[in-house]
């Protein structure tokens, strides 16, 4: 009987949301737990009286923190190899990737702002038990895969600065991260500002080098706007670029970070918040695009120069983060390696912060578990150290560099399991009501998303079949490997199809009753109660997420 009454309430409210009026729907706590009310978040909120630029600054933080992940060692490694191997031909991947990143990061922010819940919490509510656990495990794997480049990048930086073996540097990364998390207690904003400054110092060096080597503007523009995948390994490098740019854990992170901001509970207030978060993300990702453009352009120009010395030609043939400092010699001279190493160290540590928070939100959302930051980071880092240590001992610097590319490809293959739920939730009337994505955003995001998924599946299948044909293993070994791998590929494809076509079954949003104008007016103006009818919850201010060290 209760289920019938709830369904009747849904039927009464959802049509009102579709009549074209701007009724802001309220979050329904389907878990049965009371959400905290923020009684000071109404039209009298001081934020509502601020000038536009001051109001915008009060929302700044989440987008820039997320954007640090677009400048991590994984991005630098894939950029360097893309430039060295293909010159400017893969710049279009960077352009499309960051445009798509802006779309989905804004969708993640809007999802959190509109629902009062972040992506992992909504996944827990929507999907069956075993699907939920599989998504949680895949999300944790994405955090670990994203941490591998930070481990190796930090080890490379320590190798350049102190001439210690790479594998020893890998072991040291566990201690360096604990030191970083310990320093947060003494001024995390200052620490993050210092890290950001060092990262942008390295970016400035690449911009300076680009002005020195003067890449062909025509070739750069062709690379940006004419898609091409020619040459050996181009498809793999393109997938690695996408994996380094569009990371699954960033979607969970951004949808949670926005909840640390206080927003007035009105249509105008929440729409303003979505608008400001979009502007912030757009500005941050534009800077990230320019930096990635500079790195690829410098790498492509220097490594294709006709007067390249034999020593540098050998470096370009197997370019890694550990050997890339020579690219900055024209700007920095003999000090290029030291300055580059310090900036590389900062790049690795900045991404450690975002990875720690993303892991916390994923665990809290899916499993309702919380860990102290240092424990959470230590567990993730220890798991990431294991493959990095083995590869660095066996393969040295070049092997560790290839592991970064492999980790980026893993992130690209992991993407559908965070992206598809995000696209479905943000386009769903039962989740977002009238504030779901416009038809244009739905079409564009699904085309780009399915395009990336299709490329991944194509590369996975053709690459594996080609490897089976060309390797020197005995036929029995090939058959045994095929028996294991082909079912896994089929499971991957079926899982993507399941997430894509599964119909959402949980209604998490209800609008004001269409027969109660007072309720509709109250929701429009940010009031919490109507004179008649059921009391409706606000889109909650998440006090449990308000300890994020972001600038006020």
From Swiss-Prot:
UniProt GO molecular function: cadmium ion transmembrane transporter activity; manganese ion transmembrane transporter activity
Membrane-crossing segments per the record: 56-76, 89-109, 130-150, 151-171, 193-213, 239-259, 276-296, 339-359, 378-398, 403-423, 439-459, 479-499
GO BP annotations listed: iron ion transmembrane transport; manganese ion transport
Listed GO CC annotations: plasma membrane
Comp. bias regions, Polar residues: 517-531
Region (Disordered): 517-552
Cellular localisation: Membrane
One Pfam family matching this protein: Nramp
Biased composition range(s): Basic and acidic residues: 535-545
Keywords assigned by UniProt, alphabetized: Glycoprotein, Ion transport, Membrane, Transmembrane, Transmembrane helix, Transport
Carbohydrate attachment residues: 11, 19, 307
Topology of this chain in the membrane: Multi-pass membrane protein
PANTHER family listed in its UniProt record: METAL TRANSPORTER NRAMP5 (PTHR11706:SF77), SOLUTE CARRIER PROTEIN FAMILY 11 MEMBER (PTHR11706)
Family: Belongs to the NRAMP (TC 2.A.55) family.
NCBIfam families named among the record's database cross-references: nramp (TIGR01197), Nramp_1 (NF037982), PRK00701.1 (NF001923)
Entry function: Probable divalent metal transporter.
Name assigned to this protein: Metal transporter Nramp7.2
Protein's organism: Populus trichocarpa
